[in-house]
Structures are given as C-alpha cells and as structure tokens.
Design a protein with these regions (language model features):
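Small-residue-rich transmembrane alpha-helices
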Residues: 276, 280-288, 295-298, 319-351, ...
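N-terminal Sec/SRP start-transfer signal
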Residues: 1-34, 289, 306, 315, ...
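Short cytosolic juxtamembrane segments of multi-pass membrane proteins
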Residues: 2, 387-404, 775-787
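Juxtamembrane segments of multi-pass membrane proteins
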Residues: 52, 58-64, 417-543, 547-551, ...
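Interfacial "coupling" helices/loops that link adjacent transmembrane helices in transporter permeases
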Residues: 15, 264, 280-320, 672-714
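C-terminal transmembrane helical bundles of large multi-pass transporters
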Residues: 501, 609-616, 625-734, 738-745, ...
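Membrane transport/envelope proteins' first extracytoplasmic loop
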Residues: 1-276, 288, 307, 464, ...
Length: 787
C-alpha cells in the first residue's frame, strides 16, 4: 500500500464519527433518490406487464344500446386492432350483515372463452361456468373488505329484480387497479365493488340480447387515438353514445399516472437537498483537514509529490466517504422502495409486484453523489495544492478579532464574556455560519413537507365536504327523471332536507382548447351544495351562464365574461355558446355549474333531475337504505361520511409511513450538520478551550462557549427553515396540481412545532455527544507547541 493511502485510511479512522455523519447524509440523499425512482420503476414495470398480459384496452365508450352488428362498423375504423362489446350495469348489492348501501358494477364475460380485452387475473377460486346465471367473479379489494372467499353469497338488484349470486372467484383487472365508484371522490372498497358474470343472463335482464352498451378497443401500432375516438363517437352517437375516452382519461389509469408523476417530483427534489447538504459538510470537513495539514502537504510537495498526486490523495479520501454513503444509501433506498411499493399495492390493486432496482438508478445515484461531493471539496483541495511549500509551511495568519456587531449596538454590558466570544466567532466565519444555518433549515423544511401532506389533505376534505358539499347522502338515479322523484325522496322517514341536481356530460371548448367534464345543475340558494371562492365565502349561483372552477378556467384559458362552446354528450346533443359568469374554488375534481332550470333549457328538456342530495337523521340511515333499494330508478347512493372514513383508513398508513421516512431523513441532516459543525469547531478551537480550562474555567463554561454557538445557529435556522419549508410545500402543492385534485398550501401550527422539536432534539443529541469530548480534553497534549 502506498504511503499516501496509509495516510488516507489513518485520517478516515481518526475522524470516523464525522465520516459516519457525512455518510449518513449522503445515504439519505441516495436513499430518497433510489426509493422514489425504484418505486416508480417497479410500479411502472408491474403496470406495463399487467396491461400487456391481460390486454388492457386503449379506448373506452359507453352508450344506451346498440345492436351487435355495430361491432363490425367499429372494427372497420382505421387504426382499430381489437374490439370487444360488453353489457355493463350499475346495481345495488345486498351484503349479509352489512347495513350500509353498497353499489356495484356488473360486467359481462363472453362465453365460453372469456373476455378478449381487460382480462381478469384469478387470485383464488375458479372462473364462471358457461351458462350459469347465478355465478359471479368479484374484485379482490371488495372481497377483502368484506372477507369474501369463493363460495360466499351476495344478492344484486339487477334491473329491479333480486338475483342471488355465488362468488366463485376473486379476481383483479387492469381496468380497475384503482377502484372508485362513479361520482365518488375516494375509493371505498366496502361500499363499491366490481363483479363479472356471464353475458347471457345479464343481457336478458337489461333487454340487451344481441346488443351491447359498452365497448372497448385496442389500437394498431402508430394509429391516432384522437382520430379513432372521433370516428367511434360518430358510429355510436345514434345509439346514445356518451363520448369515447382514451386510456389517458380512464379513471384507474389516470389516478395511477398522477401517482407516478408525484414520485418523479419527489425523486427530483429531495436528493438535491440531501446531496447539497452533504456537499457542504464535505467542504467544511475537507477544509478543516487541509488547514490542519498545511505543513504536511507542504512537506509532501517538498519531497517531490506533485500537485496532482496530492490532489488525487484528497479526492480518494472524499470518494471513500461517498462510497460508504452510496452503499448504505442503496441498501436503504431499496428497502424503502420495496416498503413504499407494497404500501401502494394496498391502494392500487396489482396481482403481483415486479420489484426492481435498475442499474441506471444505481449508477445515477453514485455519479450524482460523487459529483456533488467532489464539487464540495474541490475549492479547499485546490487551495491547498496551489500554495508553494515554503508558504504552506508557515502557520496560518491569526484571525482578526474585533467586537461583534451585536456588541457595537450598545448591549455589550448585558452580555457575558463567553456569550461575546460566541457572537464574535459566528461573525468571524460568516460563510460557514450561514451554510450551517441553511443545512439545519433544510432539515426543518423536509420535516414540514413530511407533515404537510396530512395537513393539506385534511384541509382539502374539510373544505370540500364541510363548506362546499354538505350532504349526508347523494342519491343517484339510473337516468334523468321527473322532478316528482325529488318529493318522493323527501317523504322518506329520516330525511330532513334535500336538494335536487342534474348531471350532464359535456365537452367544453374555447378556441383550440377543450376539456371533457360534466355540468352540474343545482338549485339557487342550495343548502347542501355551496359555491365558494378562495376565501371560503359563498358565490351566488347566477340564473344564466356557466360557473367554472378556477383550475378548469385556467386549463381552457378563459375568463369571466367570455363565451364557451358547450357540446352536450347525451340526449339531443345540442351545441351552445354559453357565457362564463363566475369562477369558484374547489380542491377536488374539475366541475362546471349552472342553474338547474337553465341547464334543462340548454338541453331542451323538461324539469328533470339526475339525483338528490339529502340531509338525513343518522338514526334512520339504515331504513333509508332499505327504502332506496326498493326504488327501481335509484342506481345507488353515496354516504359522504363513509367515503371520507374509508379514505382516511386507506390513506392513513401511507401518510404515517411518509411522515416517518421524512422524519428519519430530516433527522439525519440535522444530526449530520450539527455534529460536524460542533466537531470541527472543537478541533479548530481545542487549544483555545483547553487554555480556558487551564485558566480556571469549569467544564460547563467551556462547553457553553462551543455548544452555545451551535445553539444560536440552530435557533436562527429554525425560523429560516419555516420559510424554506413553506416555500417547498408551496412548490410541492403546485407541482402536484392536476384535474383530479389541488393540494392547498395549508400548514398547521403543530407541523411547525413538530419540525422545530425534532431538529432541537437532534441538535441536543449531537451536542451531548460533543460535550463528552470536551469533558475529556487532554489539556497537556492540546497545549503542546505544534512547531
């Protein structure tokens, strides 16, 4: 082994605790990078494999009813590869020993070969026997929520008739990886399920013999999805087509794609912070090492070692530290990635997980870490090797000592001598002090981000369902029906109040921009549905014109007072120019609103409603559910409280895991920065502190001088961290914004106190470790003359 290599390993061992602290910060950065990208790659690979093996469709369309021979016309559309027609129906399910209303979607399976597209993966049990009308397959999430196994029995109200069904198999489908009820906001596995049964009995129940009301397609390579959708809409329009959609807007795929986008954002943000802090730590450690070894470096150069040789020596030392951090980070990241992926599997239902930590991710993590570390150490090393040996052998010029700015403000008499020493030392090294503050501040910021999502989601739900939508129950009809149905529901025992509504699917267009959504027709002065602005103040519903959420208005590039083209996707399909009269604020979905009477006039129809929002007496809910099951026109109902409860039960584990990970990673930064700063300060000032001990200062007083500096920097860093954290949270909220939801930048006071508390505890722990070293200073060795 070369002499310089022996020197390098000896120095690494001598400063092993500092090396460990830096390696932990690097490991945190690498871990967050590997965690995010490996989770993303694993889920993407799993999704792609599932889609391919089980023929997930690329275009979807629903309609009223079309004869089966229309399938040939659809297959003839240029760019269409495979076509499958189906019968699908929303039904009410009766679950034994479960009082709440349960909705389901029944989908037909063609006999005897099963589905061509959107095939089902059999988790347990068997497939349906051809010709059987009483057998069904059930989605795994729904089965797990109710403890169903093959052989269990449930009842479905199919077109007004009760049908007993035996569950023969538990399955998963690429079409329902993320399973959410129509009109629902959150997944509720207990109250919404997807079932599959033979086509013949399902078609007979809905007068669909030789007909279909649902069609899915795959496309030929290179085909234009937009062109196929346009031609498909033309084919199915006479049969009550509701407008075809591509895979990108299919609800399950859409939610999963948004989750992938979030992981990409995290992979971009957090590693930069961690590796930036690691770069700073390496800078101060190498700077301290180079200063301490001025004479050694000069001696080496005097004995013939080149600048390049000395430079390579310090580069190797930095590289060894990085390698330690990268290796630990890869292991940490892989473990966190697997845990994260398995956590996502609880929400997104895949049949298996193809977990992978790819070579590009590993190489990328190593290269980025090494680059950041070398950049951090570069200045100090170049400064060391550039000095002539004769100059480097001289001791460094003593630092300039003068009163601190605070002392010159007239408060000198109020400060003790040790306190003045602390302030002077901080001011004498402004760059190092500032970088320490920034490093600690970033740990506060990361902690705030970890807690922010919980704060924001709670706020989002509170605003959406506490201020905007205040119903207890949303009852949805099979199809638009007479206003008289509203009074029928009001007369149910336990119903205290109700507001009718109308839903109409539309394409909204402004110039070259368009967006597919639904206009919700509501009553002026509605008690249960309120339009609100960004200040949570009510916005009056205009008698005429359209009201849009601000997000949708931005997507369309339209402002209040301008005209929007409204293309209705059902009924007579009118196309109208409607003025935008107001903008409202919502966190969930993208909605358009109109006065219900004005919407019915736009449709050219009578006084129709699509459903009713109800305020109910909780004591009568079970009776209300039973009554609703007896009304044929009712497609189902949504209990808002149950949906919210189910959402938090599902998301609670995810939010908790995320908070724990962020706490661990942020704690590593705080400890790494504080400990290294304290150790370097101790190394630089050991002679000074030892001199004070010899002069009669007690251990506590000497510790105060050193640790007081760290305490001041930490206390200054915390409010700076609050500013960084709020900015980072605002960026995350903006980056995660989509048509599915907008996360508000809401940070609870408890988040500030928690973030500050964790950083303070981390600082105290680091301080106590350094305090032990101060207490055991070797006064004789430290005071020996270096020359």
């Amino acid at each position: 082994m070369k002499m310089l290599d022996k020197k390098m390993f000896r120095e690494l061992w001598q400063m092993k605790s500092q090396v460990l602290a830096i390696a932990i910060v690097i490991a945190s950065g690498v871990g967050s990078f590997v965690m995010s990208l490996s989770t993303l790659e694993s889920l993407q690979t799993t999704r792609a494999t599932f889609y391919q093996e089980y023929n997930f469709a690329e275009v979807f369309a629903t309609l009223k009813r079309a004869p089966e021979n229309v399938k040939e016309r659809i297959a003839g559309i240029p760019g269409v590869e495979l076509v499958e027609t189906r019968v699908a129906a929303n039904v009410v399910l009766d679950i034994p020993d479960f009082a709440d209303a349960v909705r389901g979607l029944l989908i037909s399976i063609d006999e005897p070969y099963g589905s061509l597209l959107n095939k089902t993966y059999l988790r347990s049990g068997r497939m349906i026997v051809p010709g059987r009308a009483d057998e069904a397959l059930v989605s795994e999430a729904f089965a797990e929520a109710h403890g169903f196994e093959p052989g269990a029995e449930i009842a479905a109200i199919i077109n007004g008739r009760r049908q007993e069904l035996t569950i023969v198999g538990v399955v998963l489908s690429p079409e329902y990886i993320y399973m959410i009820a129509p009109g629902g906001v959150f997944p509720d596995f207990e109250r919404y399920g997807v079932l599959w049964m033979n086509r013949e009995p399902l078609a007979s129940a809905y007068d669909m013999d030789g007909a279909f009301n649902d069609v899915t397609l795959t496309l030929s390579p290179g085909a234009s999805e937009e062109a196929v959708i346009e031609l498909l809409d033309q084919v199915i329009e006479p049969y009550g087509g509701f407008g075809a959609i591509g895979r990108d807007t299919q609800i399950s795929h859409r939610f999963l794609s948004e989750e992938f986008r979030s992981l990409r954002i995290m992979a971009r943000i957090f590693p930069i912070i961690f590796l930036g802090v690691a770069s700073f730590l390496l800078n101060i450690v190498i700077t301290r090492l180079v200063r301490a070894q001025r004479e050694q470096v000069a001696t080496l150069k005097a004995f013939g070692y080149s600048n390049l040789g000395v430079l390579w020596h310090f580069t190797k030392l930095t590289t060894v530290i990085v390698i330690l951090g990268v290796v630990a980070g890869l292991g940490l990241g892989a473990q966190l990635a697997r845990s994260m992926a398995e956590m996502y599997m609880e929400i997104y239902k895949f049949p298996y997980l193809e977990f992978t930590v790819s070579l590009p991710v590993v190489v990328g993590a190593a290269v980025i870490s090494l680059t950041a570390a070398l950049l951090g150490a570069a200045y100090s090393v170049f400064q060391a090797v550039s000095q002539p040996p004769a100059e480097a052998m001289r001791p460094e010029a003593p630092a300039i000592y003068r009163e601190a700015t605070v002392e010159r403000l007239g408060v000198k008499r109020l400060l003790t001598q040790p306190t003045r020493m602390i302030l002077r030392h901080i001011e004498r090294q402004p760059v190092k002090s500032m970088m320490t503050i920034i490093g600690i501040a970033f740990s506060v910021a990361i902690l705030m981000v970890g807690m922010f999502f919980s704060d924001a989601i709670y706020r989002m739900v509170q605003v959406q369902f506490g201020f905007a939508q205040r119903e207890d129950l949303a009852v949805i009809f099979v199809e638009p029906t007479s206003y008289r149905a509203y009074y029928e529901l009001l007369n149910l025992e336990g119903v205290e109040y109700g507001d009718p509504f109308r839903f109409v699917p539309v394409d909204l267009k402004k110039d070259h921009r368009s967006f597919r959504t639904a206009i919700q027709g509501i009553e002026p002065g509605s008690e249960l549905v309120r339009l609100i602005d960004t200040s949570l103040q009510p916005v009056p519903l205009p008698r005429e014109g359209l009201v849009l959420t601000r997000y949708l208005a931005d997507v369309l590039g339209v402002q209040a007072g301008e005209m929007i083209t409204v293309k209705v996707l059902r009924g007579r399909r009118p196309v109208r120019e409607v003025p935008l009269t107001a903008l409202v604020s919502e966190y969930i979905g993208v909605s358009a609103y109109m006065d219900r009477s004005a919407l019915n006039r736009l449709m050219g129809e009578g006084d129709l409603i699509s459903g009713v929002y109800l305020a109910t007496d909780e004591a009568h809910l079970e009776d209300i559910y039973l009554k609703l099951e007896e009304i044929p026109r009712v497609a189902g109902s949504v209990n808002v409280d149950n949906s919210i409860e189910s959402f938090f039960a599902t998301m609670g584990n995810q939010l908790l895991t995320w908070s724990i990970i962020m706490t661990m990673l942020a704690g590593s930064i705080a400890i790494g920065v504080v400990y290294n700063s304290a150790r370097i300060a101790l190394a630089e000032r050991s002679r000074e502190l030892a001199s004070l001990r010899v002069l009669g200062f007690r251990r506590g007083e000497v510790s105060y001088i050193l640790l007081g500096e760290i305490a001041v920097l930490t206390l200054v860093a915390i409010p700076v961290g609050f500013i960084f954290g709020r900015g980072l949270c605002a960026y995350m909220a903006s980056a995660f914004q989509s048509d599915l939801m907008r996360i508000p930048t809401i940070i609870d006071p408890s988040t500030y106190s928690y973030s500050a508390g964790v950083v303070l505890v981390s600082s105290v722990i680091s301080g106590l470790i350094v305090r032990r070293r101060i207490d055991h200073l070797d006064l004789v060795a430290v005071l020996k003359t270096r020359e």
